[in-house]
């Protein structure tokens, strides 16, 4: 039986496209293969030749046309003959093991009828034939090594089969008699797909008959007699044998015929008109006469007419759904049926008009409700006095009862475009929706995914090139509809598989596709008008919603729900009547898109639709030719219109314009429902409409519903059916009878009361077990795998589930065993594999000799023993779930849909029951027991074992308590009730429901399946009962295995047990006591008071407090009245005791609603989740959360917090993200994941399925709620056994702070709701600032109240202590909204950060050495330096944010904050790193030298003294930093500043004019030569900025502040206007403003550019200069807006030009262009700039100054030419701050120069730079004089110090102000440089070391490079000789001598301690940068102190 033993998985090859089962091509294909038609393509021709060779060799047939290829007749004949030859015993091992099966069912309390009571003989022939054919299929697909020339022939009785070249040959032996084929041995041939279709038909018949046989015994009256089925099949074969292919048309009328008969039985329940029956029967008779098979039809009708019961007759539906051709009636039949049922023509003109008007009215009303304003209307056609006009002009809904109202007037109203849809938006929907391609080749080839990005890009390109707006595309609609070439639409099987919306969409020609998507995406814009439509929901969601709807008001008494699910026949086809046009035209009017929607009908009339599974791309001329050829061969339409082409209106093309069709349908249904005046909900999705109606019913006090009411209900339901039908008929829609009839269910209290599932077609479902939808390729695995799900749905149809299960077991043993257990398939192949593929697979056990023809006979009977094993395995699995799992067990319907957790419990309970019954076969028992123990081992995930077959998971967000409550009420129904009063109540309810059921059952022969599930049993106020069914894993395992000590709880769950107890929970009201409030609640209160104001709070919440619990001792809880104790108001007692007695003999306490709160983190998370405004706050939250969850670097306090307060292992605290995943239910089927373990106390999980199985409880009390209750019950039970009185002692935890209780807990404790606070503030949103920053977010630990400064420092400190995974926190920090940080002062944060670094270092030392070494200041400083350098990059980024909020400018200014905010991250990593490192090292030095005590990190909580210490440290730092409030933190480029202090306001604006800064530049003229443009080679630039983290910055970026010095003088003019573009905030403007004091300024920072180069950081001007100094001179404020500053935007350039013209037209204007233009998008920028300059040139005399920096001289020349503006001469301005490692200079283009067409050549530029170099050499070589600093103002000195230290910082050396003198500098470098190498730990506290002690691993090339640079500096400082050849410098070796000390470069010491050399010379550029930076400095002022 086991076919699954191959060890290689083979990829299933797809069949030839022609073999799709539903393809009309099979006939045309076989005609082409047998020479009856010319092959359409090369492949088929070759295939034909190969078949011909085969038949010549083996059958001596030369002419293929002699082969019989009529598969219809052949298969009918074969079926007849083979059935006669079969045994009359069903061949299945199940029957030999009937006893085993009987005992299995007995174990589950089912009785299996005797084997003899089933008439298996009737099922045997089909069953056995099917088994043989299936075996042949399996054998033929098994991979084995094939030798050439060996034939594989399969036999089935006398029939022989051979698979050849994609076809099947059928023949018989000479010996065997019986004419199987026309002439003895002459073979017949059919395509493989036809053979599969035949096997499928046999399989379905076998299953249908088998099911009928079983149901005959288990569910009497449910199914037809097997005899009548067999006679139907026999007649059908006979008909097919006689008439062949055309008879299929007749069989398609089978269902309408069944309907006519049903209509007779059920009266007009179907709403069938008499003439419909006559037409159908007449049509059938006519067809039969035409085909000469009248007798056959009569025999069929006799069988039909003999059926007199509705139920069995119902099963005749769908008997022939499996024919392998499209289910399309012939044209005549369609017309005949349409004339009767679709009758749009029968509607009178008045009715039609009324209809159109109703639709317009509906649109109007919906618009009004959705948008609260009337749509735009054109009322001109209405008379001015019209009543309707008057209402509409006032935007009202007209009163229809008014005598003046006339519905007809709506016809004259036109909508004017009312719904806005921006072009870009529509196009984006359009693009994301579909991939659209013009490439027809892609239609057929495999591998084109529907969502191919490149296709979308092509489309976008196409639109951009051809259309400027959506309107244009719409306008093109006319042409498209009328274009001959666009008339083809193709369907491609693959597309359907991908579920791309609109079945016809896939291969539609290009332009109609464009329209189609455009139409859909525009229609979606109306979604606000049609909330009922859910196009995106899957079937699953639809089911969910339906389920939820029926529960929506389950607690309201006296309401009954009626659910109907409408299914409509040929949905889109039928709607293409003119009636729906009103909807389309209304949409067109509202959208302003005529004729996009209105013409939709036409496209169908004019379209040819081609089956895309055909082998050739559709093509009209080719198509017509083939069509002719087909007609000649007598192949009739519509089956094979050539390549499967059919016309648009003839069905098939579903789904186009789906959304609008849905609107049409919805409006009709809504119209019917409104007339009922009942509460109703509608969900619509295409042709699926679900309607839920809520009907009030009168229920008597004794629970009985009167006859009158039940009759009213039935009439109501039927009337709705009828009116729906007549309304839908107006659109030509017919309801699908079977589906609609069987969908209606009536429920009360959310439970099904009347479910017509018994009408569902059991046989049809059984037979469809093997149905394959046409999209799947026909391989055996797909062929078989349909079984599991079909059986599952089958079990819903059958009342006695034993029948369905028995059927499943039979099928399973027949070969689905593997599917039932593993659900994997291996080693199958398509019979026509390519040889090499088969060759790779090892040979199977069959050896075939060369050249001999071997016939493989397959034994009909299989070995019995093997069958028994299979059966056992199947049954064991079926107990524990998986594919056949659920079938035999009566699972309550809502449990089925509940999800894994309940499902597992349910299975285990069933398994346990079976095990305890002792009736199970021991082998099965053994298997089940071993499986049940699985959860104890970690090897197998429990949920893998219980893989629920229900994909439907309606896990609504309920907590454990709700689940328990729900389950309890269910279980309660099964208890023996002791309380008389209660028992009487329940009895009453039962009586009422039974009466209702009886009434419903009166509906003819329909017997409803009853469900006694009642929601609310007793009055809640009096008492509440519950029993729990769900518990922890421990309890669950107890359920499964009977040997645990905790059995008592299981007893409660057993149905048949005698020892049940019932407990009552009493509730007593307590007097209210004032309770304690935790800091979180106080902080919230504070927040509420200060809402809308910028008050900074004084408390900060503490999670420890919020999670603090009190333990309550039950012995005295009721008497204790003290303030701290909480009262628990529930306790248990035995049933039937009055309250007073219960108090005296009370049982254990049960906190029914669970009294732990969620931990704060989770609480804040849930509060914030989903609110877009507060979502950002979550990011901040997670920063803080990570403080709690880091491990190593935190103190004991946090560890304890995690272990005790949160009841989890700190190391495994999951991120909130995991929690979110869990809530979303991801990974549910994959198993219950570890990540789902709850955050905080266990009641936090939101869904029962997130249970974590192997839990270690921290305390015996801290368990989840279910366990609480169970424990209460178990304790109570123990007490009852030991004592008579119940005095339980179950202590429990409760949260201290009552204000933290949730709503349910408040109810529980009788605590009234506090007054809720409403925000009546008018400000936009400042309150959230405060909320998101401080309130509801936990702090690291409990601190005394702090002012805001200290609090901020704490955060900074936290950041420095927390080492996040690379970039994690950083990213979150940056993506936070700025408003949440608006009140944090950066300086505070930095101070906190500095302090944290010190603390962190000291603590790490403490951890390493067990004690802190008290060393002298120097060594500690050095170590700190190292520590800071190690950690700086990790943390630098976290501080680098600025403030950004235009609205709060004034508020910020008032607080002393700088208003400027760039859009990108403002400072580079390097800069921040430098700033932080310098700041913290300075601060640390001061703290240590001041000798103030720095405490070690505290082990327990932080106390007052620690806080004082940290404040002291911070204040000390403040004095160093000169932080006097208020201050303006302005970030200069950090390369320029020692720390992040601001420019003091007191600085004079003219400081920068001091001598030192007055730098004269060198001016060079560049003259253009006669070098025509074409000769200039345009060099492609690479990305040269230092953004790449792998490149060390190429030296120091020179600052525009210095570069522009002296230019204003050189220009020798005073302009009328200054325009600045680029340059950050334009430091470049400062030198000019100093020179020209009163020139007005236009300031346009190029933000776009800034974002691109932000890694380099730009200069930010002091706010005084900007705000105070420049503001008066600003011309137009709006130019500061980021959007206007982007000159790549044409509008901005125009604006700039206009402003210049307006203010200083014809004057002289200076333009400073500071744009670094060397990146990827340079062409755009360059052309924009050229354009801008050209425009400005026309309106004024323009002098432009451009910063140009390029890496090669060619690029420099190129760039100069691009900005030269046709000037003959441009001037180069160069000064010492320009870089020398690249070609950098200012290019000045003067306004008044003459023009020329020539360009500056590369040679000219090179010469200019050479001159500059020569001049420099002459001006002064770098001398070796003493180090000295010129006298500078202190401020500038600091700037320059900063510059020096930042140069050194690039080599990882931190310098302080003390090091700025020559000797100190030398000493520092010599001593600290070796520290860059990581020596081993033992060297840390020694001052000497050995060479062998160097830890080689720590030495990277970077460090060696840094050493070389520093050694070079030592040489320069010591000897005054500065070598400038970088190439030779980096090749030298650098030595370290004993000490260790660094030696000058080029010197080798006597005792070499270590030496290093660079491995590669790639560092030349870096070295040049470093050297030039220091040389510039040295040239400017000698390093060191005077």
UniProtKB/Swiss-Prot annotation:
Pfam families assigned: Mononeg_mRNAcap (PF14318), Mononeg_RNA_pol (PF00946)
A GO term, aspect molecular function: ATP binding
One annotated Gene Ontology cellular component of this protein: virion component
Domain RdRp catalytic: residue ranges: 560-757
Presence of keyword Lipid metabolism: no
Domain of life: Viruses
Keywords: ATP-binding, Host cytoplasm, Hydrolase, Methyltransferase, mRNA capping, mRNA processing, Multifunctional enzyme, Nucleotide-binding, Nucleotidyltransferase, RNA-directed RNA polymerase, S-adenosyl-L-methionine, Transferase, Viral RNA replication, Virion
Domain Mononegavirus-type SAM-dependent 2'-O-MTase stretches: 1592-1788
Keyword S-adenosyl-L-methionine: yes
Reactions that this protein is recorded to catalyse: RNA(n) + a ribonucleoside 5'-triphosphate = RNA(n+1) + diphosphate; a 5'-end (5'-triphosphoguanosine)-adenylyl-adenylyl-cytidylyl-adenosine in mRNA + 2 S-adenosyl-L-methionine = a 5'-end (N(7)-methyl 5'-triphosphoguanosine)-(2'-O-methyladenylyl)-adenylyl-cytidylyl-adenosine in mRNA + 2 S-adenosyl-L-homocysteine + H(+); a 5'-end (5'-triphosphoguanosine)-adenylyl-adenylyl-cytidylyl-adenosine in mRNA + S-adenosyl-L-methionine = a 5'-end (5'-triphosphoguanosine)-(2'-O-methyladenylyl)-adenylyl-cytidylyl-adenosine in mRNA + S-adenosyl-L-homocysteine + H(+); a 5'-end triphospho-adenylyl-adenylyl-cytidylyl-adenosine in mRNA + GDP + H(+) = a 5'-end (5'-triphosphoguanosine)-adenylyl-adenylyl-cytidylyl-adenosine in mRNA + diphosphate
Annotated localization: Virion; Host cytoplasm
EC number(s) given by UniProt: 2.7.7.48, 3.6.1.-, 2.7.7.88, 2.1.1.375
Assembly information from the UniProt record: May form homodimer. Interacts with the P protein.
Role according to the record: RNA-directed RNA polymerase that catalyzes the transcription of viral mRNAs, their capping and polyadenylation. The template is composed of the viral RNA tightly encapsidated by the nucleoprotein (N). The viral polymerase binds to the genomic RNA at the 3' leader promoter, and transcribes subsequently all viral mRNAs with a decreasing efficiency. The first gene is the most transcribed, and the last the least transcribed. The viral phosphoprotein acts as a processivity factor. Capping is concomitant with initiation of mRNA transcription.
Family: Belongs to the rhabdoviridae protein L family.
This protein's name: RNA-directed RNA polymerase L
Organism field: Hirame rhabdovirus (strain Korea/CA 9703/1997) (HIRRV)
